[in-house]
Regions:
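Secretory targeting and sorting signals
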Residues: 1-33
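PDZ/PDZ-like groove recognition
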Residues: 29, 299-315
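Protease-domain processing segments flanking chymotrypsin-fold serine proteases, especially trypsin-like
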Residues: 29-125, 314-315
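Conserved catalytic-core segment of clan PA serine endopeptidases
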Residues: 86-108, 115-119, 139, 144-197
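Cytochrome P450 catalytic-core helices
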Residues: 129, 133
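Short beta->alpha transition motifs characteristic of CBS
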Residues: 134-137, 254, 271-279
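Chymotrypsin/trypsin-fold serine protease catalytic domain
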Residues: 158, 168, 183-256, 284, ...
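Catalytic nucleophile loop of clan PA
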Residues: 251-273
Length: 315
């Protein structure tokens, strides 16, 4: 097996969901001088359920996470022998291209998420049985309920499921998303009932305390404006850094929520795509309205992901 070094508001309910789901178009505007100054972060507070809907208790267990550095840290991804090497909105035109080599890493580790058989969201593997997505992909703040009927297929290509399909054994998101619909903590983690990542591989991820402005990045996922199960992506750069969000002009569409935002040179995930551009952003801690936005991997999220990926699905 080969290994790649990958660095592991309270608002109205309707506005939160609308911002997360709608797709619009306009010309991106330049960032202002102070766009990267607000790097204050909000701490994570996990809440979860098992496959029967029973609440799960949270208690950190991973010593690897507890000992992570204060300046920045990373965790390696994994390329399986089975994989070969290799809401979002359209900002101006559509720069996305279709990616058909879904059995090649890292595309193989990007997860097509369906709900009741229909295109729903995107995720990305972080271990053999663990994936990351957006919080609104697993919990509806508007309806105040965990979403059911979800299935997860890494490396999907149209109707093809080269690494099979799994269901959720555990589902996690943030208390701030559940109670407030906070866009600053719109993250989700799913423990699967199968070890799909053993064949698909998984991403590494990273965090740093400073800004990511002008970092070259990739954004790939399964949008619902294309044929079901088609993987589309675009290259670009991070335009603005916030404490809990990263902002960019790479084109996306609904159902690309949960997509990995990863650095181009090493395939290291730094954020989780969650929102399209537009109104409904009320604080300086959110991305400027002309940009698409992703939940930033902070130190807290980094440590949480390490912890959750090390847990047994039956815990």
């Amino acid at each position: 097996m080969k290994k790649f070094r990958n660095s592991i508001t309270l608002v109205a309910r309707t506005l939160v969901v609308t911002t997360a789901l709608l797709a619009t178009s306009s010309l991106a505007l330049p960032a202002t001088a102070d766009d990267d100054t607000d790097l204050e972060t909000t701490d994570v507070s996990p809440v979860g359920i098992d496959s029967s809907g029973n609440p799960l208790s949270w208690h950190p267990t991973n010593s690897e996470a507890a000992s992570s550095a204060d300046s920045e840290d990373s965790v390696a991804g994994h390329e399986s022998d089975s994989a070969e090497s290799a809401p979002s909105s359209v900002i101006t035109g559509d720069g996305r291209t279709q990616l058909t080599d879904t059995t090649s890493y890292p595309n193989s580790a990007i997860v097509y998420i369906t709900k009741d058989g229909k295109t729903h969201c995107t995720g990305w593997m972080i271990s053999a049985d663990t994936l990351v997505t957006a919080g609104h992909c697993v919990y509806s703040f508007e309806r105040e309920e965990w979403l059911s009927g979800l299935e997860f297929s890494p490396g999907a290509n149209g109707s093809e499921r080269p690494f099979e399909t799994a269901k959720a054994a555990q589902t996690w998101t943030d208390t701030s998303w559940v109670k407030k619909g906070s866009p600053l903590l719109d993250w989700g983690v799913v423990k699967l009932d199968k070890q799909l990542g053993e064949r698909s591989g998984w991403f590494g991820f990273t965090w740093r305390p400073g800004e990511y402005k002008d970092v070259k990045a990739e954004l790939r996922g399964y949008p619902d404006d294309k044929n079901p199960g088609e993987l589309w992506g675009m290259s670009g750069t991070v335009a603005v850094s916030r404490g809990n969000q990263l902002c960019y002009s790479m084109d996306t569409h609904s159902a690309q929520s949960g997509s990995p935002l990863y650095m181009s040179d090493e395939a290291l995930v730094i954020g989780i795509h969650a929102y399209g551009k537009g109104p409904g952003r009320f604080t300086s801690r959110e991305c400027p309205s002309q940009y698409n936005a992703g939940t930033r991997i902070t130190k807290g999220l980094f440590e949480l992901f390490l912890d959750l990926r090390s847990r047994a699905s039956a815990e």
